[in-house]
UniProtKB/Swiss-Prot annotation:
Residues 161-336 form the Helicase ATP-binding domain. Residues 364-510 form the Helicase C-terminal domain. Associates with polysomes. It is found in: Cytoplasm; Nucleus. The Q motif is unique to and characteristic of the DEAD box family of RNA helicases and controls ATP binding and hydrolysis. ATP-dependent RNA helicase involved nonsense-mediated mRNA decay and ribosome biogenesis through rRNA processing. This is ATP-dependent RNA helicase DBP2. The gene is DBP2. Keywords: ATP-binding, Cytoplasm, Helicase, Hydrolase, Nonsense-mediated mRNA decay, Nucleotide-binding, Nucleus, Ribosome biogenesis, RNA-binding, rRNA processing. Belongs to the DEAD box helicase family. DDX5/DBP2 subfamily.
Length: 552
């Protein structure tokens, strides 16, 4: 069997070479338990999947991630016997080291890495780049970078770019807000532009797996920003919304697919797309995907992709579960760590812990909002449950504060509207549940308020990491009650590592049995933001309450 030979036709242009011709009309499919690998269509030949149909009709799904991970998806997908497949070679090494980089001595490189708290593992790791020009990106990418006003690559970008452009498998560990998305998106553009053009029936060339639909949407925005000039098409595939539009996007052909694992398996299992053309694979927020129970789906997906692909894994932490996944599916990978691989907070965030009772929380919250409103800043308020988020939003709106709630029970249309209101500044207060702490990317959030302390310190670190992003500073207030004392010892460790003030009451809780809140996984969901009175989105629940006499 083979994927078929190359036929004529020109590939994409660009400074990394003109690409290759398209794939020829191979006729063999891959048998697996009665279903052919690729849904009955040959690789490069045959008919496309049709029109997909459907529109944005029907209700929008509820749960965060659309409940993808809760079902036995992919039960019909068998592992491909890649030893029996004649794989067509593809290009993945595009890196030409800039003379300025080559001329740097080892001591200069070590000094730069030390200044960025960067550690490296692996053989023959390329030197980092210190400017965008040194990375050797095509002009169409450089022009977009300059439009965004960045002065230099972030720490993770400076090392990940030469690694990824070299075709290496890569593990990158860095805190949230460190520029990881651009770290893998820009090399993806270069990779795709050197591959043969898509043929009818082909699936994506670059596949990016993400834990939540919000993160998938945000990655798609970044990919569209940089890929538009070379006419790269993207699609985002996630649960909680009708499948019809996503099927249509897949069947029209998209070089880049950003997907949550459950919905992607659903699409592949139903023959709506295939992963035969994937040669560039990214697992973003790998630790979070495993936290949310996606490991079985991830393993099924990776078994459907050719083993000589390039694989990049990005994660905020490096627990044993992520290490095991990397060991199973990455080949001779290089690793870059920014900061410690232990759980640590963003040092650009000032952490203020206020010990109080449940009854005192609302009074403290109003006091903090009065301060924040005077600065005209944006704030996210995190709660432990959807009910608390709704109750608190109702209270704030009736008291004159322009708050909006977002969580897993909100329909996708309303969630999108709330996020737009928050980003625009029309709704500067967003009340959210914990899962949103990983899916939200708004760079100008000045404050985070943990109205409820999370059930684990990992969520605490990621929630306060919604502020202090992209080199900015931020402030995080956390209300800590005696009921949270089990998390005191781990919280003290996080505060001490970041050189933050530790309240005396917290130290006492830590001494007297307050340890072991754990870094376990939570299943909470949601996110919210906004301000009433601007229409659209079909507001429900607390978001539909009129704002009282304005206090903002």
């Amino acid at each position: 069997m083979s994927y078929g030979g190359y036929s004529g036709g020109s590939g994409r242009g660009g400074s990394y070479g003109g690409g290759r011709g398209g794939y020829g009309g191979g006729s063999s499919s891959y048998g697996n338990g009665g279903s052919s690998y690729g849904g009955g269509s040959s690789y490069g030949g045959g008919s496309s999947y049709g029109n997909g149909g459907g529109g944005y009709g029907g209700g929008y799904g509820g749960g965060y991630g659309g409940g993808d991970r809760m079902s036995n998806l992919g039960s019909n997908l068998g592992a491909v016997d890649w030893n029996s497949v004649n794989l067509v070679p593809f290009e993945k090494n595009f890196y030409v080291e800039d003379p300025r980089v080559s001329n740097r001595s080892d001591s200069e490189v070590q000094q730069y890495r030390a200044s960025k708290q960067m550690t490296i593992q692996g053989q023959n790791v390329p030197k980092p780049v210190t400017s965008f020009d040194e990375a050797g990106f095509p002009d169409y990418i450089l022009s977009e970078i300059k439009k965004m006003g960045f002065s230099e690559p972030s720490a993770i970008q400076s090392q990940a770019w030469p690694m990824a452009l070299s075709g290496r498998d890569l593990v990158a560990i860095a805190e949230t807000g460190s520029g990881k998305t651009i770290g893998f998106a820009l090399p993806a553009m270069v990779h795709i532009n050197a591959q043969p053009l898509l043929k009818p029936g082909d699936g994506p060339i670059a596949l990016i797996l993400a834990p939540t639909r919000e993160l998938a949407n945000q990655i798609q925005v970044e990919c569209n920003r940089f890929g538009g000039s070379s006419r790269l098409r993207t699609c985002a595939v996630y649960g909680g919304v009708p499948k019809g539009p996503q099927i249509r996007d897949l069947q029209r052909g998209a070089e880049i697919c950003i997907a949550t694992p459950g919905r992607l398996i659903d699409m592949v299992d139903a023959g709506k797309t295939n992963l035969r053309r994937v040669t560039y694979l990214v697992m973003d927020e790998a630790d979070r995907m495993l936290d949310m129970g996606f490991e079985p789906q991830i393993r099924k997906i990776l078994q459907q992709i050719r083993p000589d692909r390039q694989t990049l894994m990005f994660s905020a932490t490096w627990p044993k579960e992520v290490q095991r996944l990397a060991g199973d599916f990455l080949n001779n990978y290089a690793q870059v760590n920014i900061g410690s691989t232990e759980l640590a907070a963003n040092h650009n965030v000032k952490q203020i812990i206020e010990v109080c009772t449940e009854f005192e929380k609302k009074g403290k919250l109003i006091g903090h909002l009065e301060t924040i409103s005077a600065e005209n800043g944006k704030v996210i308020i995190f709660t432990s449950t959807k009910r608390v988020a709704d109750d608190l939003t109702k209270f704030l709106r009736q008291d004159g504060w322009p708050a909006l709630a977002i969580h897993g029970d909100k329909q996708q249309q309303e969630r999108d509207w709330v996020l737009a209101e928050f980003k625009s500044g029309r709704s500067p207060i967003m009340v959210a549940t914990a899962v949103a702490s990983r899916g939200l990317d708004v760079k100008d959030i000045s404050y985070v308020i943990n109205y409820d302390f999370p059930t684990n310190t990992e969520d605490y670190v990621h929630q306060i990491g919604r502020t202090g992003r992209a080199g900015r500073t931020g402030t995080a207030y956390t209300y800590f009650t005696p009921e949270n004392s089990k998390s005191a010892r781990e919280l003290i460790g996080i505060l001490r590592e970041a050189k933050q003030e530790i309240p005396r009451e917290i130290e006492e809780m830590g001494r007297f049995g307050g340890g072991g809140g754990g870094r376990g996984f939570r299943g909470g969901r949601g996110r919210g933001r906004g301000r009433g009175g601007y229409g659209g989105g079909g507001r429900t629940g607390a978001n539909s309450f009129a704002v009282g006499n304005s206090r903002w």
